[in-house]
A protein has these predicted regions:
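Helix-turn-helix DNA-binding elements, focusing on the entry/boundary residues of the two helices
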Residues: 15, 26, 37, 52-55
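Short, charged recognition helix plus adjacent turn
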Residues: 2-4, 68-79
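Short alpha-helical DNA-recognition segment
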Residues: 23-42
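The alpha-helix within a helix-turn-helix
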Residues: 19, 30, 59
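Residue-level detection of the helix-turn-helix DNA-binding "recognition helix"
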Residues: 20, 34, 45-47, 74
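A short, Lys/Arg-rich alpha-helix, primarily the initiator
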Residues: 1-21
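DNA major-groove recognition helix of helix-turn-helix/homeodomain DNA-binding modules
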Residues: 53-68
Length: 79
């Protein structure tokens, strides 16, 4: 079974796009998700991969299901 590598850059792009659609800054999102702004910035730039807990916090702060973010990531990995 093929399991694609989770590309940190794709994860970051997806989170960044969801944040911008919501119309909030990294500062606001990091506060809502209870993570550091520099940590969020590193995730969005593809420098760090979020843990499941962090991804859940980000999704909750964005008022979206974590599965929606994961589905979008999967779509881009398969392209």
């Amino acid at each position: 079974m093929f399991v694609p590598t989770l590309d940190a850059k794709i994860v970051g792009e997806v989170i960044n796009e969801y944040r911008k659609r919501k119309g909030i800054s990294q500062e606001v999102l990091s506060g809502l998700a209870d993570i550091g702004r520099t940590h969020l910035s590193a995730i969005e730039r593809g420098k760090r991969k979020p843990t499941l807990e962090t991804l859940y916090r980000i999704a909750t702060a964005l008022d979206v299901n974590m599965s929606d973010i994961v589905i979008e990531i999967e779509k881009r990995i398969k392209l």
